[in-house]
Amino acid sequence: MDEADGIILITLKDLGCEIEENETIKNFDSEMVYKCILAYLRVINEQKVINLTNTLPKNMSARVNACSLIANIIKDSGYRSELSYHNLLYPNVNDIRKIFIFLGQLLPKKEVESGGVSIQKLEDQICQYLQGCVKESWIPYFCPFSKRIPGNYSTATLFTTTGGNLRIPSRGRQLKVTPGLEQYYSQYLEPLTLQTNRFEDIAPSVFEYNLSIYAEAQERDNEWNDKGVSSGMNPIDYRKNKQKQVLSKMNDSIRQSIIDGGNNQISSNCNSGDSFLDIISEFRGNSLDVGGQFNRKKAFTNELNNNNNNNNDSTTNTNKVETEIETEEQRQLKRQAEIDALQSQIDEISESIQLHNKEMLDFLSLMRQSESENLEQDQQREVLEKQYKIKKKTFSLLDDAEGNMKELQSLCNQTSSNLLEMSGEWEKVRKPIIEKYRSLKDKQNNQADETKSKLDRIKEMRILIKKLVSEVQQKDDQFQQLQDQYKQAPKDSNRSQYTRRILETVKNIKKQKVDIDKVLLDTKNLQKEINTITDTAVRTFELVKDLLYNDAKKDQTAKQAIKSFAIIDDKFQKLFKTIDETGNFQNNILNLNSKIEHVSQKTNTLNSDRVVQDLKNIKSENQSLIKQIKTLIETKN
């Protein structure tokens, strides 16, 4: 019972009942029993107890009504034992335990865990796997990338698409890294069947897409086998290093193209055939680029050459050396002037770059605005073209209005007749399809029921297996404990003691058997004596009766003897009945004593003082209600 009480307490805690750790079912009062049963019923069927309060009412009549309603609900659920409101108001441990066990069996089954994985987790894993399979692009069975059927695929036919590259939704880390990519895939990306111009190009496009992915993967594997293994890095670091190298090369090439394009003149309007260098030089924003880096270097070197030439001329002309010799301070001043001029040129160039960048941004915004306006104008043009075509057709039909009306009427009649024929044909096709659908649906429902029943059986078997495993483990532990105790027990015990005890128990059993046989023999002998005595008494009574009747004809005293004998017979019969009744009464007394003991065991927790107090409360409530009724009647009169 302690194990059952422990399971019940755990279940009640799971249902949300506030139970202390050291509390047991024996300590439950009527308030606690009401809360616990209400928690059970709310999980089983909340609609039936939706009107009941969370706590037991203080009013006695309301208590009786609430407990009666709960008792009726439990009986309707299939409870077979006797149950009434007094079983809940004055709880008994055995009755409450039975009720809790019954309600626990009606609770909805929880998830049965097997191997540490619940059914809900298994269903989530299946859903994730199926979602991943749906998101993946279809791969033909003969494609090596699918890794399904090994073999030689050199004879596989490759297809090319005329509808452009396909856009397949990607998954994994790219969705988390790229913001808005998942929204684009779910809301704006067209389905695979609409990305091609023709329906016939869908399969070839898919084949080409899959083979291109396989080719890229093969190239990556070949590159890794050729270069990556010798680099001493793992594949992830090798890819990152390669990406960095590619980005650095691109940056260097762009930077070099910008530097090389600094000396070129940039036209204001770029044609569609302009090169990448021209576009970059245009974005630099200076057509002449007077202050370019290489122009400045060239000018600076030319000035140095001129200065060197002048110095050579001064050395040749010995007469002008003294007048043209420059001091160190003058040189520094000249260099400072050159540096200031270069700095001013740099500032002008940076300002011009900023201005041209602003102009470029304005140009881009204007270009986007013009593109949006062009799209709107194209849409308006398409709408106007449709309206123009409709109006053109209507105006062309106005010349012969009556004839055209007749033709339209005939076309309408023909279309209506075609629709009727098609509806009839559709009904012919629809009926077998519906019947087949219904049969398949019924079959599916039956299969679902069978699978459900099988799953329930599997769950029950798993529970049983777990119980058996736990029992086996307990038995193993018990066996191990007993074995340890046996090993630790003293080995000097004498075998004669055990044999003597066994012999004593056998002797006691034999003595008890002899006593039982004696009692049975005495009862048999007593029954025989009773039977013989009753037989002799009946025979003597009949004999005496016959003798008295024979003597009564001759002797007057015999008649008086017959009367006294009849009185004795009547008293004897009464005595016999009283003896039988006393025996029956004694048997009934024994039965009633056993029942009283049984009932006392049930009602050992029943408090008579509490019942008397409740009775007094009910009487006081009844008196107050009677007074209220009288006052209401008097007020109405």
Swiss-Prot record:
Coiled-coil portions: 322-489, 608-637
This protein's UniProt keywords: Coiled coil
Extent of the signal sequence: none
Molecular function in Gene Ontology: cullin family protein binding
InterPro entries xref list: CCDC22, CCDC22_CC, CCDC22_N
GO biological process: positive regulation of ubiquitin-dependent protein catabolic process
Transmembrane segments: none
The keyword Coiled coil appears for this protein: yes
UniProt record similarity statement: Belongs to the CCDC22 family.
PANTHER family: COILED-COIL DOMAIN-CONTAINING PROTEIN 22, JM1 PROTEIN
The protein's name in its UniProt record: Coiled-coil domain-containing protein 22 homolog
Source organism (scientific name): Dictyostelium discoideum (Social amoeba)
